[in-house]
């Protein structure tokens, strides 16, 4: 992934390597809001062969709850950049939403997706770095909740750091 300045729009591209040179740039996905912080930017092929991409909220927390925005999400696309028919939102690369700044993810031995996320360290005394079990179409709550909540619209983290930060 990389960002194009001055627009701060992130994108994921594929290149062909020939004689130690990059050529044949192919954009898999673009128009991902970016900023100086909270860019996410992890990419990983899942056990289903799909490409997963974490995006931060681009220091605009409300984008995490906007299903039309690609910020504050985990995205899922085919290796050619098209959107899988099985994605939870029709014609959308959004796989899960309500993320602040997911820093990494992987799948356990049972093919369950697990993601780490930076909490809002220093902001109003909240920290709550999180470990989340990612499920398709689910809302992980940022910025409406931090840590655990009784609000059934949101998925609670599997684990969070409380009022301290791990990272």
Q: Model regions: which residues?
A:
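Acidic, Gly/Ser/Thr-rich repeat motifs that build Ca2+-stabilized beta-propeller blades
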Residues: 1-62, 104-120, 163-167
């Amino acid at each position: 992934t990389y960002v194009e300045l001055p627009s701060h729009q992130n994108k994921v591209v594929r290149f062909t390597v020939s004689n130690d040179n990059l050529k044949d740039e192919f954009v898999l996905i673009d128009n991902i809001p970016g900023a100086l912080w909270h860019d996410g930017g992890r990419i990983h092929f899942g056990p289903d062969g799909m490409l997963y991409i974490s995006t931060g909220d681009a220091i605009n927390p409300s984008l995490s709850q906007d299903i039309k925005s690609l910020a504050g999400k985990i995205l899922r696309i085919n290796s050619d950049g098209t959107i899988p028919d099985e994605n939870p939102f029709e014609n959308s690369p959004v796989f899960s939403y309500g993320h602040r700044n997911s820093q990494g993810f992987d799948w356990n031995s049972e093919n369950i997706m697990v993601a780490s996320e930076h909490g809002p360290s220093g902001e109003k005394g909240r920290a709550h770095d999180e470990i989340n079990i990612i499920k398709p179409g689910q809302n992980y709550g940022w910025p409406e909740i931090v840590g655990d909540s009784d609000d059934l619209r949101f998925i609670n983290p599997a684990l969070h750091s409380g009022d301290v930060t791990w990272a």
